[in-house]
């Protein structure tokens, strides 16, 4: 049975899908999976699923010369021809916000069985998009899974994956089966901390001077440890500014480490005794690897992509209400002393590189109003 899996998403989104992919690999055979991901994710996908066939989705996010849509269509034509020439027993799309090109590439796959989650972009009520999606559903008889409003124990993205895999396998899939996991594939350095404070989404940023205060407070706990400041290659300039602030504040054991690829990033993250980050891909990497992790969570898109955890090693720190506030202020709602205290508690209660206590996924009791 050959199955086409379409995941045209970002790095963190791919990590959130790894649990679903592993469940499908166990049930259907990893060698029968054909996984299509963006160019930057191809090495990571190959390392995590070495027996699957990995196809590159060569789309760009920014226009250089051509109109972006035209550029992406031209570059994706070879992929479209490959998908049309290959017979699949089923096609599964794990993206819940499909644009027109992604919709086309999904349905160009040669199969009679399509599985997808409801396209959330339909909620903006644009007539053309609605007509395209409805027409595709009718023509290809797609099995559509409604996007979950929210689960009691999983972010809605992971819950959507669980529901979709359940439909494909025609059996109930437990929440524990679908939790994201990453595996190391090379040498894993140990004895270090990681601080990943940068993201492209400004509303999720925790100010670097406040990070400095946190790491100053954690100096007694970081004695003998290297603190690796990490991120994407284009984050170097901001990380250099951060490093200068740390050194000026007396934190001398920090250094910038930018792994050459995502596979090396996984190995670096896997050996960390503590990961300090915000709601970005680093949080999902660290959690999927079950490392002691403190996420300073802006609460943006809360319930959709996070919080989630594999065990009691992961803590997502939410902003707290201040006096007279109707909603939490980010990042004022997570002051450095509170974050440092949470990190110390995490270090104290978790043995380094030891066994963790798996999280028991049970439904929460309804809150009393």
Question: Which stretches of residues belong to each language-model region?
Answer:
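Catalytic machinery of carbohydrate-active enzymes
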Residues: 1-369
